[in-house]
């Protein structure tokens, strides 16, 4: 089966998200859960101790995950406009870490049933709050790291416009103009969709909607480059040798 | 045939990927089905289909329209790729010895269970036919290709294809009967 | 269902959309060499003459531009690199990489247990990766597996 090889930048990006998942020695295994079950066989006190220990470690890992996301977020190079969005996301991550601290404080005084309730509540809270936040942080990171592509595409478009104009003056084919027009529309679409994605962050739209806008904008860019390639093919047949 | 196909092909021959894209979108499912029915395994079908279109795009410069649909050319490439695939495996595949799981078809996951089971029986039986018979069954009875186009793909006369499809169906029915017993 | 009806059902088989998208992208990223046409017909020969004439004229423009025979203001300086395939390819590839990253959504990375990146290589479908990655890469034995925070919380709630 074929697969795409991505350069280290992709690895760094994904690595940062995955590091958040298991930050700083936070590796929880199925045998940790098995140990709780095994402790139950030794008696209630043993089970309680095991549950408290694993629950404490789990919530601490969740907090470390949020901290790691925040560190990555704050490490992004953003423009002034985007600092507002980053600040909003960072504040929400602070809220998440505060929540985890409050839950951690409860664990020490909880019985077996109490630890089960805390675990259930934290699980539900993550499903209703944290997972959306983490998704949005991932989206924002992706969006920030894509911005240079739009700048590059615009610069490319300007250069291609110049060469097409020049060749038209020299009597070249009209199909260059048609391909260029398509490329111009696609680059503009990409920029509009990119702006919509920025607004989606500001309006705190659901992460899946934001991601869809990011994907659309990147696809428009990709389609614009197909047109650049087509123009390149025609130009190369017109100019047999590179200067 | 795709709308505006002739223009797309002309542009694709000139190297325009924006023209080859729509051709890919239109023909990829039928080539995939053709390959999948012959090889049975989704991963293999995906790999081979990918190779078909890669080969088509790499060699599009040499494509010349000769009064036959573009799909005929793609089917011919697909037939060759399947042959190469089996050569590369370098082993005689005995259907009896194959793990049934090999033929599990995620591509048919959306069908109801009884249809899926029927399809799988038929697919296994088709896989046991000789390659020409497999091809004529897929082209004529699954993809509904006109006789003329099927004959071009198979590089045979229309009369030969008519005879072959009759024999292929008879053989397939015999194998299914054998399976039942 | 009779045999012919069953055969008709095969027409409903569709390839996996994710595979189709990835395959399409990989294929179109390949740049074919422009065809060298074998010129047999008079029409093609005539067109070739016209194209050659245009090419000569354009080359002449470049020569004159480089030698400064034209006064500068009327003509825009032309950069051949604007359509250089190698640089276009590099930029297009950067976009394709971002598209691939966008497709690996947080939801996917949230449900998988053991996505690992090794030397910057993305292991296709993270779900597939988690089931096929060797356990040595996960640093676990066959008997245990790394679980997510949510899985641990679910386990502890019982």
Name what the model sees in each region.
Chain A
Residues 21-125, 194, 205, 230:
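Leu/Val/Ala/Ile-rich N-terminal alpha-helices, chiefly Sec-type signal peptides and the beginnings
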Residues 45, 52, 59, 150, ...:
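Solvent-exposed, well-ordered amphipathic alpha-helical segments
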């Amino acid at each position: 089966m074929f697969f795409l090889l991505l350069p280290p930048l992709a690895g760094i990006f994904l690595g940062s998200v995955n590091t958040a998942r298991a930050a700083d020695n936070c590796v929880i295994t199925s045998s940790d859960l098995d140990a709780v079950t095994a402790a139950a066989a030794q008696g209630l006190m043993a089970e309680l101790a095991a549950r408290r220990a694993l629950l404490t470690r789990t919530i601490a890992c969740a907090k470390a995950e949020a901290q790691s996301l925040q560190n990555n977020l704050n490490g992004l190079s953003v423009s002034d406009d985007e600092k507002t969005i980053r600040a909003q996301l960072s504040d929400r991550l602070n809220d998440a870490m505060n929540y985890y601290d409050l839950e951690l404080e409860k664990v020490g005084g909880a019985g077996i049933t109490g630890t089960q309730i805390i675990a259930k509540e934290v699980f539900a809270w993550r499903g209703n709050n944290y997972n959306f936040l983490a998704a949005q942080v991932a989206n924002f990171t992706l969006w920030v790291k894509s911005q240079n592509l739009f700048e590059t595409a615009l610069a490319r478009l300007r250069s291609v416009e110049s060469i097409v104009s020049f060749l038209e003056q020299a009597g070249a084919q009209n199909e260059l103009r048609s391909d260029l027009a398509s490329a111009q529309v696609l680059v503009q679409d990409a920029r509009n969709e990119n702006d919509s994605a920025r607004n989606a962050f500001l309006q705190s739209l659901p992460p899946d909607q934001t991601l869809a806008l990011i994907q659309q904008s990147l696809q428009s860019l990709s389609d614009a480059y197909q047109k650049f390639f087509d123009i390149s093919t025609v130009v190369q047949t017109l100019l047999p040798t590179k200067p | 045939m795709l709308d505006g196909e002739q223009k797309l092909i002309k542009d694709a021959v000139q190297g325009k990927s924006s023209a080859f894209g729509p051709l890919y979108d239109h023909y990829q499912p039928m080539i995939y089905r053709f390959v999948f029915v012959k090889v049975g395994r989704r991963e293999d079908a995906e790999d081979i289909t990918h190779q078909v279109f890669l080969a088509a795009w790499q060699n599009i410069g040499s494509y010349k329209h000769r009064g036959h649909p573009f799909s005929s050319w793609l089917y011919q490439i697909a037939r060759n790729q399947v042959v190469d695939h089996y050569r590369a495996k370098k082993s005689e595949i005995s259907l009896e010895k194959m793990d049934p799981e090999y033929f599990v078809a995620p591509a048919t996951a959306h069908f109801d269970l009884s249809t899926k089971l029927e399809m799988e029986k038929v697919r296994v039986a088709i896989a046991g036919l000789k390659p020409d018979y497999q091809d004529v069954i897929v082209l004529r009875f699954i993809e509904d290709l006109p006789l003329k186009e099927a004959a071009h793909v198979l590089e045979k006369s229309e009369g030969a294809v008519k005879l072959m499809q009759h024999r292929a169906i008879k053989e397939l029915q015999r194998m299914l009967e054998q399976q039942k017993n | 269902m009779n045999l012919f009806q069953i055969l008709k059902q095969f027409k409903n088989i569709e390839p996996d959309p994710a595979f189709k998208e990835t395959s399409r992208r990989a294929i179109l990223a390949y740049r074919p060499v422009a065809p060298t046409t074998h010129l047999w017909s008079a029409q093609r020969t005539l067109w070739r003459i016209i194209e050659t004439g245009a090419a000569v004229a354009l080359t002449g423009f470049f020569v004159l531009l480089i030698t400064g025979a034209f006064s500068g203001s009327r003509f825009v300086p032309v950069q051949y690199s604007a359509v250089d395939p190698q640089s276009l390819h590099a930029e297009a590839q950067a976009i394709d990489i971002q598209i691939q990253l966008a497709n690996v959504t947080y939801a996917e990375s949230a449900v998988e247990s053991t996505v690992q990146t090794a030397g910057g290589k993305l292991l296709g479908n993270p779900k597939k990766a988690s089931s096929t990655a060797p356990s040595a890469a996960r640093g676990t034995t066959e008997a245990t597996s790394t679980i997510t925070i949510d899985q641990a919380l679910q386990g502890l709630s019982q």
